A protein has these predicted regions:
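Divalent metal-dependent hydrolysis catalytic cores, especially in the metallo-beta-lactamase
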Residues: 17-55, 70-76, 98-105, 134
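Active-site gating/metal-coordination segments in enzymes
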Residues: 55-141, 147-148, 181-185, 210
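Short, acidic/polar
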Residues: 29-39, 81-92, 190
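His/Asp/Glu-enriched, well-ordered alpha-helical/loop segment
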Residues: 245-287
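Conserved, mostly hydrophobic/aromatic
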Residues: 40, 60, 91, 100, ...
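Hydrophobic faces of well-ordered beta-strands that scaffold small-molecule active sites
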Residues: 1, 47-50, 72-75, 98-102, ...
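Single conserved hydrophobic/aromatic residue that forms the stacking wall/gate
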Residues: 2-11
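Catalytic pocket-lining loop regions of alpha/beta-barrel enzymes
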Residues: 113-240
């Protein structure tokens, strides 16, 4: 049996407090872990990394405990926490998170030159000390600032989301299938910057989110140059497939999302395919 480990997945129940995104993740969104498990079993996917919609980890901690060996958790940045290091320790103890998703490095109107003065540096430093993974999804200016942080914190592990596209949430829309969509060039003009970050051995990248950027119908052939670039710069050992469940559950479908590995990277060896669909994630997370 093949062993696949999925990347970003989201589970949510209305009874738990969480962040609401109108039209995309309304308050009544009901995505129990059991729905994800059913799809995983039908596609021979064994394990999943789950990321909630906001900094509330209640359900995440519950399903990690309820299904031992099945899930690993990545939390979301909690901007309301007065002490980021303490917040991390509390969430590690309560919910066993192994990373934090963030979307910026400095929120200042006038960004300082010293990366140690960036608004998110205390969090990033605390994450590096605790060997937590940075789940990163941000626009290009913030990626450039992250590059400076990595000069100071070279051991910090960063996982770029969704094929390394660098987009602003200000540009986020919802498509006809109730999925996130960004209007952007394909290939994006930020590949050179992404390639610079790929030179650092502690950077990784999701093979995911193609539907949100592509101008073509499934299997998104305009994403072929992006897939090729990622393969050539990061390599299979730093690539991890992600489904982006639940947004893809209906269109294109969970199995179809997994099949994009073969559609967009048709020349992989079996060992490379297994690395992208499981080995890399297993090297980064404990299940």
């Amino acid at each position: 049996r093949d062993k696949h480990v999925t990347g970003v997945q989201t589970c949510a129940l209305p009874i738990y407090p969480r962040t609401v995104y109108p039209g995309l993740a309304d308050a009544d969104l009901d995505v129990p872990a059991e729905k994800l498990i059913s799809l995983m079993e039908s596609t021979r996917v064994d394990k999943a990394i789950v990321v909630p919609l906001g900094p509330e980890d209640h359900y995440l901690g519950e399903i990690i405990e309820q299904y031992p060996g099945r899930f690993a958790g990545v939390g979301c940045y909690d901007g309301s926490a007065p002490d980021q290091a303490k917040n991390l320790d509390d969430r590690i103890n309560k919910s066993n998170i192994q990373g934090i998703r963030i979307g910026e490095v400095d929120a200042s109107a006038d960004t300082p030159d010293d990366p140690r003065q960036f608004s998110m540096f205390p969090l990033l430093e605390a994450m590096s000390e605790r060997n937590l993974r940075v789940w990163f999804y941000a626009e290009s200016r913030q990626v450039q600032l992250l590059e400076k942080v990595l000069d100071v914190l070279p051991q910090l592990v960063v996982v770029f989301n969704h094929c390394g596209f660098m987009v602003s949430l200000d540009n986020l829309t919802v498509d006809q299938h109730y999925r996130p969509h960004f209007t952007t060039e394909v290939p994006p003009p930020t590949l050179e910057l992404l390639g610079r970050l790929a030179e650092r051995p502690n950077t990784y990248i999701h093979f995911s989110g193609q539907y949100a950027f592509s101008h073509d119908p499934y299997p998104y052939p305009d994403m072929l140059p992006v897939a090729d670039f990622i393969y050539n710069t990061f390599g299979p050992n730093r690539m991890l497939w992600a489904s982006d469940f639940p947004w893809i559950a209906e269109q294109p479908g969970y199995a179809q999302q997994l099949a994009l590995v073969d559609h967009l990277l048709p020349n992989l060896t079996q060992a490379e395919r297994q690395q992208i669909t499981g080995g890399t994630a297993a090297s980064l997370f404990d299940f």
